[in-house]
Amino acid sequence: MSMSQSALIKEEISSVSFQFYTSDDVRKLSVKQIVEIESFDMLGGPVPGGLHDPALGPTGPAERCATCSLDFIECPGHFGHIELAIPCYNPVSFQTIFKLLKNKCFHCHHFKHGKPIINQFIEELTLLFKGDVVKARNLRERNVLLRGYEEKKKGKSNEEGEEVMESDESDSDKMDTDENKTNGKIICDGVFNAKEIYSGKATHIEDFKREVFKEFFGSFSGYAIPCGNCGAYSPRLRNGDASKSKLFIMPLHDKYATKNSAIKLPTNFSSVKEQTEHGTWFAPWEVLDNMKKLFENEKEILDMLLGHLVPIVTNKGGAKKNVGRQFTKESNVDSLFMRVFPVTPARYRPPNFVNGRRSEHPQNSHYKGMVKSNKMIRQSIDAGEGKAKFLVNSVCDLQMHVNNMYDNSKSNSNTNEVANGIKQILEKKEGLFRKHMMGKRVNYAARTVISPDISLETNEMGVPQYFAKTLTFPQPVTSFNYNQLAQAVINGPEQYPGANFIEDENGHLINLSKESQEKRIALSKTLLTSHPHAPRGVNKKVYRHLLSGDYVLANRQPTLHKPGIMGHRVKVLGKNEKTLRMHYSNCSTYNADFDGDEMNIHFPQSLLASAEIREICANNYQYLVPRNGAPLRGLIQDHILTGVLLTKRDTLFTKADFQAILYASCWSVNTKHPIVTPPPCILKPVPLWSGKQLISAALNQLTIGRAPLNLEAPSKIPTKMWGTKGLEITRDSHVIIRQNEMVAGILDKGHFGASSYGLVHTCYELYDPDVAGSLLTLLGRMFTNYLQSRGFTCGVDDLLMKNKEEKFRVETLKKANEEGYTVAAKFADLSKYDEQKARDFFSKALQSEREVARLDGLLKKGLNQYTSKVIDTLIPGGQQKPFPKNNFSLMTVSGAKGSVVNFSQVSCLLGQQELEGKRVPRMVSGKTLPSFQAYDASARAGGFVMDRFLTGVRPQDYFFHCMAGREGLIDTAVKTSRSGYLQRCLIKHLEGLSVQYDNTVRESDGSVIQFNYGEDSLEIGKTPYLTKFPIIAENYELFKSQFPMEQLIEQLKNQEVVEYNRSIKTQPELDPVMSKFNPSSDLGCVSESFMNQLNHYIESNPQKLIKTTSNRDGKINEKDFRNLMYLYYSRSMVSPGESVGLLCAQSIGEPSTQMTLNTFHLAGRGEANVTLGIPRLRELIMTATTKPITPLMEFQINDSTNKVETEKMAKYLEILKLSDIIKDITVQEYFQDTNRNYDIEIEFIPTLQQVLSLHRIKEKQLNKLFGEFNKVIKRQVKSQGKLKVNNGDIGLGSKVRGSDLVEDDSLTINDDDAPANDDTTNNDENTSQQQPSSQNKKSKSKVITQDDDSVAAKSKNKKKQNVNYEDGEEEAEEKDSDEGESEAEESDDKSDVDSDSDEISNSRSSNSFSDESIEFDQKKLTFTISVASDSKKVLMLGIVETEASKFVLKSCKGITRCFVNEKQVGGKTHYSIQSEGVNLSEIFELRDKLKIDEIYTNDIYAILQKYGVEACRQAVTSEISNVFAAYGISVDKRHLILLGDYMTFEGGYRALNRIGIENNTSPFQKMSFETTFSFLSKASLMGDYDTVTSPSSRIVLGQIVKNGTGSFTIVAPVK
C-alpha cells in the first residue's frame, strides 16, 4: 500500500463543468477502433479489433495490457471507439434538436425570431451570466412589452395579406441599431472571469434562466409563424418513433405554399420531390447540414443558450498561454450528434463464467449491434439506389442501438433481456450516485446485538474484545507513548491489547499477523528510529487495538435525527462477551429496545475526528432533542418506580444500608474527595436516614467545588393522589431543593426521566452536560441497588375495586347500552324506540356514508360520557388498595409504564372500538357480526365493549378489539415508507442551509434565506431556561460562575445599544434593536419578546430577589441581573456553521413517523373533513398543491353572536341541487298512438318556499331551471336508448349550475381564484356558432361534483335512490382533462353569471318548451316524455333520481357545503361558518356582511394568489404546525419558519420535489436526489457547472462538507 491516508493533499477540485465529448475528443481518448462483431476466437483468445482487444486493457488477473504493459491490478483500462457509418443523434439531445428545428427557418437558416428579438435575448442572458439579475429582470420586462408590440404589428400585416410597410421596416431598423448600441455597452466580448461565474450561480438566476429558455424555444416554434428575417413559412416537423429517434418533414400547407411562392421563396424543403401527406423521413445527415448552417448563422445566441465554459488561451510568441482565470462560452453542433461512439475499457465489461462456459457481458450487445448496423449501412451504400429502403431500416437500427446504450427503457424489445443503459446504471437507490458516490459503506465499523448494562456510565459503550482486536487506530509513535505502543507491537494481533500493523515513514504497511514473536520484538525496537531515505518530520504509526477510553460513534438505524448517531466512551468487555452494552438512558435517543435490536459502532481514524466526537458529539451533549429543545435522555421504567419508592416519606434506612447505597452510587464521582455521610434525620429510638437524604448526599458529592443548587419544581404525580387533607406542601407533590438539600417532594419521571425543567435538566443548564450525565449514572446505580433489596411486584388485588364502585359500574354500563337505543330513536325522529320502524329507517338512511358518520358522531358523544364517568369514579377512588400501596396504580401514575387507559381496560371497560376513526362498519345485511341482529341499535353491537380484561371479554367484543389492533399494525407498516420518502425530500432540499458568520441563514450558493435564524438568532437547545428568570435569579451565583462576567461585559458593551433600548421604551414605533445592531457582538441587542419578558419580570419582581427602588432588600442588583441575562442571550445564540436546514428537515421528518396514516379527521362540529397526518404534510410540503384534497374556509358574519343570521348565510353559500328540494318522485308509463309516454311527477318538500328564499331563487328563474332539467332528462333518455325522442328538439345544453340563472348580484364570481370546481354554462342559443357538438360537450360540461352518498342522504325520497359511483369518478376525470380551459370561455362564463334572468329567458326562448310540456305549482312539478313505442324500455325513475342528484339549482363556485361552528369567548357564544371548498373572491364580494379581516383558509395557493407571498409564508408555517398539533407533537417554530422561508424564497410556493429542486444551483445535488440521468443531460446540454459548495457535491468529490466544523479552516502559526 503506497498511498498513505495522511498523505498531503496539494490540490482540490474547486468546480466541475459538464459537456459532451465531441468526435475529436473520443478519437483522442481511444487507443483502438472496434470493427469486429466477435469478441473471442475459437480458442477463447481476444479477437484484434473486437470488444476485448488486448489494447483496451486486461480482462483477467493473468493478462497484461498491450497499451501500457501493466498488469490487471495496476492498469486503469483504455477506451476504444466505433466509427459510426452515418451521423446519429445524441439520444440526450434529440428533443433539443427537434426544438431548434421547429424554431429555425428552412430558407435562410436563421431563427424565426428575427435579429432585433435575438439581440434582446442576448442582452438578457449576458447580464444574467455576469450575475446582474436585477438589471436582467428589468430589461426583460421592457423587452417582453416590445416583443408583444412587434408580434401584434406582424400579426396585423399578415392578416391583411399585405407586405410590411416601409415605415415599419425603418422602425425595426432603427430599433435594431438601438439594440446594437446597448449590445455594445453590455456584452463587451463574451468573456467571463471566475468571480463572475461564481456569482452567476444563484437560485434566482437559475429560475430566470429557465424562464428565458422557455420563452425563447416556445414563442416562435409555431407552424404558422413566418421567419422574422426573410418572411418565409417553414414546413411542420413530426416526431416519429421514440426508440429510433425519427423525424419527418411534412409538406407545406397550400395556404403557406402560396404565400411563399408569392414572394419567390421555395415551397418544398425536402430532398424528396414527391411528398406524401404523412411527410418525408428527415435523414440525420440532412438534419446535421441544417443544424450546421443554423450554428454558423446564430453563433452568438447559441453560445449563450447551449455553450459550455472554455478557458481562454492566448498564442503569444508561438507559445500557448492561459490567461488568468477567464472563460468564454462556446457551443458546438458536434455535441448534438454522434459520429464516433466511445467503448469502455474491457475491465469494466468482464465476461461471466457459468458452469465453465464463458458468456459475454450484457453491455457488449449494444456495441455489437452498432458494429453490425454499421456493416449493413456500408453494404447498402455500396449497393446504390436499389437498397434505399434497406438503408433507412439499417440507419434506424443503428440509432436504436445508440439509444439503448443510453437508456434501455425506450427499447422496442418486449423481452426484459435488453442490457442496462447508462441511465439504469446511474439512477435509483442501487444506482452509481446514491449507492456509491454519496458514500454508503465504510471501514472500521462493527455491528452486533445490543444489551443493557446498568453498571456502565451513561456515556459509555461496552465493546466485545473480539471487536476491539479487529478495530484499530493509526497512532503516531512519539517518545511519550513509545513504551505503550512497543508493548502493543510485541503482543501482536492475537493478544489484547496489541496491534495489527505498523506503517513506516513511506506509507508501507507491515502486517504483524505474519510475523513471529521475535520479529515483533525486533520491530518494536525500531519504532523511534527513522529510515535514512524517509521524508523529514513523518513518524511511524502503529495500528493499535481499540482501548477503553477511546471514543466511538454509535448509531442505530433508522437514523431519523441528529441524536441517532452519538459519541460513546469505550469500555472493552471480557473475552466471552458477544454483544454491545449500553446504559438504559440512551434508549429513547436511539429509539432502541433490547428485544434483538442491532447497532453499529464506527471507530474514527484521526485525532481530529476523535476530538470532535469527545467535545461535540458525545452523548452527554445530546441531552436535548433539536426538534423542540426538550430532554431526550432519562431513566426509565424500574428506575422511575424506585425513585418514587426511595424518596417518599416513609422510606428510612439504617446507617449500614444508607452507606452501602450511597457508595454504590457515588464510587466513580469526584474520587479524590471522601463521600460524606450526613447526620441522621431520626435519632430515637434508633438513628435512621431518609431517602431524601440519599439524594442530598449524592448532590453534595457531585457538585464539590461548585455553588450548590436551588430548585423548586412540580413532580409528575398529581397532588390529589396523595390524599386531600392538610396543606399542599405536606403532600410531597412539589420538589424543593435548597443549597443541595432535598427538603420536600418525591423524584419521579418529571425529574430524572425525559422531561423538561426537572432536576437533571436544571443541572444540565446550570452546571454542564457532564454533570447531568454523571447525575443520571449516579441515580441509576442508586435506584438499582435499592430495588435489589426492596423488590417490586404486582398482584390481582391491585386491580380489584370496592363493592360500591363495582355496583356503580354495572348500572352505568347498563345505561350506556340503552343509550344506543335512545340515540337511534332520536336519529330516526321517533318519540321512543320501535325496533321495526327504526330498522326500516336505518336500512335506507345508512346507505349514505355521510349519515353513518352523523350517527357515529352522536353515539360516540353519548357513550363517551358514560366511559368517562366509570373511569373517573373507579380510578383512583374505587380501588380496594389505595395509592401508593397499589403497585399497578404506582406504575401508571409515576409514568414508569402504562397509563390510565391500560388500567381502565383491565379494571373498568375496554370502551368504544374504532376503525379509521369510525365505529365498527356494518355488512351488507346490516349486521356488524352474524351474532347481532340487522341494524341492531345497541351500543354493544356497534363495537362498544363493556367488558374488561380482569373478568374476561366475550368473543364478539374480543373480535372487535382484534380488528382495532390489526388496523394499528397495518398503519405502522404502511406509513414507514411514506414518512421515509417525505424526510428524504426535506433533507435533499434543505441540506445546504446553514448559519453564516454574519448570523444570516444562507443556501450553499450564498442566497440569503433568513437575516436572523428563526427571527431571533437563538439555538433551540439553548432556549428552554432563557426566560425561566426565577430559577436563574435563585441560582444567581451558580450561574454567574459560568462566565468571566466583568471581562465579557467590558468587551461587548456598546453605549449606542443602551441608548437605543431606552428610546424604544418611549417610542415603540422605532425599528427593533436587532435590525440596527449585531446581536453576537453588541451586549443588549436582543429580540423584542425577550426584552419585554425581562422587563416584566424585573418590574413585577415576584420572588423579591432583585434590588430595585421599591425593594431594597433584594440580593441581586438590577443592572447586574440585566447584564447576566444579556450575556446568557449571547451565549444562547446559534453557532455559525450550524446546519439548520438539516435540523429543520429532521425535526419535521422524524415526528412524521409517529403520526397515524388515517387521512381524514372530523373538524369543528364533526361534519367537515380535513386532511391530516402524512397525507396533509405531503400535499403541503412535497407537492405544494394548488388544489388541496379538503379545502375549507372559516369566517364570521359581522354580528357573530347572531345564530339565525349565521345559519342563513351558511345556507345561502351552500350548493343547492334539485334532489335537495324533492320529497317524492312518481313515474307513470302508458302507450298513446305510436308513442310510449312517461308522466313524471316530482313532489316538493313542504318547506320549499323557505329554502328558495334562503338561496334567493325567484319563481321565474325556477321555471327556467325546470325547463333545463326537462332537456337533461331527454338527453339522458336518448343516450341510454340511442333513440330519437319525439317531443321537440333536444338542445346541446349540458348540465347547468343555478348561479348562471340567479340574478342576485352578490353571486358574481370572479375567476381569479384557484379553479377548484369549475362549472361552466352552455348557452343553447350559441351552439350553432360554437364548435361541433362533441367538442362543445367536452369543454363545457363541468359540474360541481360531490360524493353522491351525501346527496342521497339529504334528499327525502321515499323510493330508494340509485346512486352511481362511476359517474362521480368520470366527472372528476373530465374535470382534470379540462383544466386548460381557454380564457375566452372563462370570460363568457362571467358574462353569463352576471346577466339578468330576463335576458336569459329571452335568449333561451328559441329552444324552450311550451307550457303544456311542463306544469309547476308550489307543491309539485309534472312533465311528460314521449319516445317511439318500438324503442328499448328505459328505467325512467332511476334516470330522474340520478339526474336530480346532479342537477345544480344554485351554487357558489368552489363551495359545496357549509356548517355552523360555535365557541365560547368571554362567556358569550360566537358562531362561525365553515365551508367545504374555498372561494375568497366570493367572500370579498360579501364584505359588508362578513368580517373580512378574520378569514381562515387551509388553501395555501389561494392565499398566495389573493394576499401575496408573505401571507403564504405565514400560512405554510401555521398549517404545518396545525398538522403536528393534532397529534400532540411539538415542533419548534424556528424550524417551521425556516421551512416557510425556504418554500417562498423565490416569490412563489415551491414544492420540495424534483420540480422544486430544478432551480438549485448544484447539478450534483439534483442528480443525487432523483432522475439522475435527466439532470445530468440538462447540465451537459446547457454547459452547466457545479461550484462544489453544496454538501452533496462535496461528498460526491470526496471533500469535507462546508458546514459545522468544516465551515472554517485552522491555520497553524509558522515560526
Swiss-Prot record:
<feature type="region of interest" description="Disordered">
    <location>
        <begin position="155"/>
        <end position="181"/>
    </location>
</feature>
<feature type="binding site">
    <location>
        <position position="75"/>
    </location>
    <ligand>
        <name>Zn(2+)</name>
    </ligand>
</feature>
<dbReference type="Pfam" id="PF00623">
    <property type="entry name" value="RNA_pol_Rpb1_2"/>
</dbReference>
<dbReference type="Pfam" id="PF05000">
    <property type="entry name" value="RNA_pol_Rpb1_4"/>
</dbReference>
<dbReference type="InterPro" id="IPR044893">
    <property type="entry name" value="RNA_pol_Rpb1_clamp_domain"/>
</dbReference>
<feature type="binding site">
    <location>
        <position position="78"/>
    </location>
    <ligand>
        <name>Zn(2+)</name>
    </ligand>
</feature>
<dbReference type="InterPro" id="IPR007080">
    <property type="entry name" value="RNA_pol_Rpb1_1"/>
</dbReference>
<dbReference type="InterPro" id="IPR007083">
    <property type="entry name" value="RNA_pol_Rpb1_4"/>
</dbReference>
<dbReference type="InterPro" id="IPR015699">
    <property type="entry name" value="DNA-dir_RNA_pol1_lsu_N"/>
</dbReference>
<feature type="binding site">
    <location>
        <position position="597"/>
    </location>
    <ligand>
        <name>Mg(2+)</name>
    </ligand>
</feature>
<keyword id="KW-0862">Zinc</keyword>
<dbReference type="InterPro" id="IPR045867">
    <property type="entry name" value="DNA-dir_RpoC_beta_prime"/>
</dbReference>
<dbReference type="Pfam" id="PF04983">
    <property type="entry name" value="RNA_pol_Rpb1_3"/>
</dbReference>
<keyword id="KW-0479">Metal-binding</keyword>
<keyword id="KW-0460">Magnesium</keyword>
<dbReference type="InterPro" id="IPR042102">
    <property type="entry name" value="RNA_pol_Rpb1_3_sf"/>
</dbReference>
<keyword id="KW-0808">Transferase</keyword>
<dbReference type="GO" id="GO:0006360">
    <property type="term" value="P:transcription by RNA polymerase I"/>
</dbReference>
<feature type="binding site">
    <location>
        <position position="65"/>
    </location>
    <ligand>
        <name>Zn(2+)</name>
    </ligand>
</feature>
<keyword id="KW-0240">DNA-directed RNA polymerase</keyword>
<feature type="binding site">
    <location>
        <position position="593"/>
    </location>
    <ligand>
        <name>Mg(2+)</name>
    </ligand>
</feature>
<keyword id="KW-0548">Nucleotidyltransferase</keyword>
<dbReference type="GO" id="GO:0005739">
    <property type="term" value="C:mitochondrion"/>
</dbReference>
<dbReference type="InterPro" id="IPR006592">
    <property type="entry name" value="RNA_pol_N"/>
</dbReference>
<dbReference type="Pfam" id="PF04998">
    <property type="entry name" value="RNA_pol_Rpb1_5"/>
</dbReference>
<protein>
    <recommendedName>
        <fullName>DNA-directed RNA polymerase I subunit rpa1</fullName>
        <ecNumber>2.7.7.6</ecNumber>
    </recommendedName>
</protein>
<dbReference type="InterPro" id="IPR047107">
    <property type="entry name" value="DNA-dir_RNA_pol1_lsu_C"/>
</dbReference>
<dbReference type="GO" id="GO:0003899">
    <property type="term" value="F:DNA-directed RNA polymerase activity"/>
</dbReference>
<feature type="binding site">
    <location>
        <position position="68"/>
    </location>
    <ligand>
        <name>Zn(2+)</name>
    </ligand>
</feature>
<feature type="compositionally biased region" description="Basic and acidic residues">
    <location>
        <begin position="172"/>
        <end position="181"/>
    </location>
</feature>
<feature type="compositionally biased region" description="Low complexity">
    <location>
        <begin position="1400"/>
        <end position="1411"/>
    </location>
</feature>
<feature type="compositionally biased region" description="Low complexity">
    <location>
        <begin position="1317"/>
        <end position="1336"/>
    </location>
</feature>
<feature type="region of interest" description="Disordered">
    <location>
        <begin position="1305"/>
        <end position="1411"/>
    </location>
</feature>
<comment type="function">
    <text>DNA-dependent RNA polymerase catalyzes the transcription of DNA into RNA using the four ribonucleoside triphosphates as substrates. Largest and catalytic core component of RNA polymerase I which synthesizes ribosomal RNA precursors. Forms the polymerase active center together with the second largest subunit. A single stranded DNA template strand of the promoter is positioned within the central active site cleft of Pol I.</text>
</comment>
<dbReference type="InterPro" id="IPR038120">
    <property type="entry name" value="Rpb1_funnel_sf"/>
</dbReference>
<feature type="compositionally biased region" description="Acidic residues">
    <location>
        <begin position="1305"/>
        <end position="1316"/>
    </location>
</feature>
<dbReference type="InterPro" id="IPR007066">
    <property type="entry name" value="RNA_pol_Rpb1_3"/>
</dbReference>
<feature type="compositionally biased region" description="Acidic residues">
    <location>
        <begin position="160"/>
        <end position="171"/>
    </location>
</feature>
<keyword id="KW-0539">Nucleus</keyword>
<dbReference type="InterPro" id="IPR000722">
    <property type="entry name" value="RNA_pol_asu"/>
</dbReference>
<feature type="binding site">
    <location>
        <position position="595"/>
    </location>
    <ligand>
        <name>Mg(2+)</name>
    </ligand>
</feature>
<dbReference type="InterPro" id="IPR007081">
    <property type="entry name" value="RNA_pol_Rpb1_5"/>
</dbReference>
